[in-house]
Curated annotation (Swiss-Prot):
Disulfide bonds: none
Keyword hit for Transferase: no
A Pfam match: Pyr_redox_2
UniProt: FAD binding residues: 36, 44, 49, 89, 123, 284, 324
Family per similarity comment: Belongs to the ferredoxin--NADP reductase type 2 family.
Keyword Oxidoreductase in annotation: yes
Catalytic activity: 2 reduced [2Fe-2S]-[ferredoxin] + NADP(+) + H(+) = 2 oxidized [2Fe-2S]-[ferredoxin] + NADPH
Cofactor note: Binds 1 FAD per subunit.
Protein name: Ferredoxin--NADP reductase
EC number(s) per entry: 1.18.1.2
Species of provenance: Lacticaseibacillus casei (strain BL23)
UniProt entry keywords in alphabetical sequence: FAD, Flavoprotein, NADP, Oxidoreductase
Gene3D superfamilies from the UniProt entry: FAD/NAD(P)-binding domain
GO MF annotation terms: ferredoxin-NADP+ reductase activity; flavin adenine dinucleotide binding; NADP binding
Length: 328
């Protein structure tokens, strides 16, 4: 499309929440553009954690990241939205007519409204805070799991105390020869059901310990631990070490887009409206009282933002009916 074409809604971000937002906009018969900075749709869920099992998605007792993304892609294409990957939005200007020009790495696009669904922004994993040979990364030491088979029949240690660390320890349990979970505190920060499952599992819990050193030993890793407020210094010998210390996010693009933020994300009101009228935000990108960083929450925010955007464009148009009345 040329710069002269004006989309009704442009969704920035092709993760699960962005894909669902683009689908729902199609359900409302809107002219939609979906922009994604990565080469593939799916966000962190599809690109970093394809084998991670999700338990908090409505309608799925459990579903892997890659299977959820596959289902969302199937849903998305029903209304044939315009989708552009490998497209980074650099700035968003408001034009004299009140609409927006999005300046991107692949040219300019015009849109009447914008929905930001960029998740946590660009991200890098928090690294292990001890010196180690960088050549170990991707061979013996990992920050992401892209294929569970990499860990099959291996002695595996997982480091971390949040939901991701617990989830990966449980996911690896039936695949690996044995799994140990290392955490610096006595208690874990995960969901109660996950912690209960961990306690019933065969995973060896190593708490409260810090990792003091990681050194190659023959074809394995020797992980020296240090007890927090104690004297014990055991050593674990494993085939692979998975670090789950969270991520450092880069949200510089939010400043370039001139959106008001706090330490948690983009500030929005109850209609998901940002500080710039006509630009909305949903999913893990946003901040409001009571916000939960769940895909399920983002799925609920998407229709709110889309319907408000269309109400802004067409105040006299009948608003959304139940989806069963719309989708055939």
């Amino acid at each position: 499309m040329s710069v002269q074409h004006v989309y009704e809604i442009t969704v920035i971000g092709g993760g699960p929440v962005g894909m669902f937002a683009a689908f729902y906009a199609g359900l409302r018969q809107a002219d939609v553009l979906l922009l994604e900075s990565l080469d593939e749709l799916g966000g962190q869920t599809g690109n970093l954690y394809p084998d991670k099992i999700l338990y908090d998605i409505g309608g799925f007792p459990h579903v892997s990241g890659k299977d959820l993304v596959t289902q969302l892609k199937t849903q998305l294409v029903h209304f044939h939205p315009e989708v552009k990957t490998a497209t980074e939005v650099q700035t968003i200007d408001q034009d004299p007519d009140g609409f927006f020009t999005l300046h991107t790495s692949q040219g300019d696009f015009r849109s009447k409204t914008v929905i930001v669904a960029t998740g946590g922004g660009a991200f890098t994993p928090r690294k292990l805070a001890v010196d180690y040979d960088p050549a170990l990364e991707g061979k013996k030491l990992f920050y992401f799991v892209q294929d569970l088979e990499t860990f099959r029949d291996q002695e595996v240690a997982v480091a971390g105390g949040g939901d991701s660390a617990i989830d990966w320890a449980l996911a690896l349990e039936p695949v690996a020869k044995h799994v140990s979970l290392i955490h610096r505190r006595a208690k874990f920060r995960g969901l109660e059901a996950s912690v209960a499952a961990l306690e019933k599992s065969s995973v060896t819990i190593q708490t409260p310990y810090l990792i003091e050193s990681v050194t190659p030993q023959d074809d394995q890793l020797a992980i020296k631990l240090k007890e927090v407020r104690g004297e014990a210094q055991p050593t674990l010998t494993v085939d692979k070490l998975l670090i789950n210390y969270g991520f450092v996010t880069d949200k510089h693009h939010l400043q370039a887009w001139q959106l008001d933020t706090d330490r948690n994300g983009i500030l929005v009101d109850t209609q998901m409206q940002t500080s710039r009228p006509g630009i909305f935000a949903i999913g893990d990108a946003v901040s409001y009282a009571g916000k939960l960083p769940l895909i399920a929450s983002g799925f609920g925010e998407a229709p709110t933002a889309i319907n408000e955007a269309l109400s802004r464009l067409y105040p006299d148009r009948r608003q959304a009916l139940h989806s069963t009345q719309l989708y055939h």
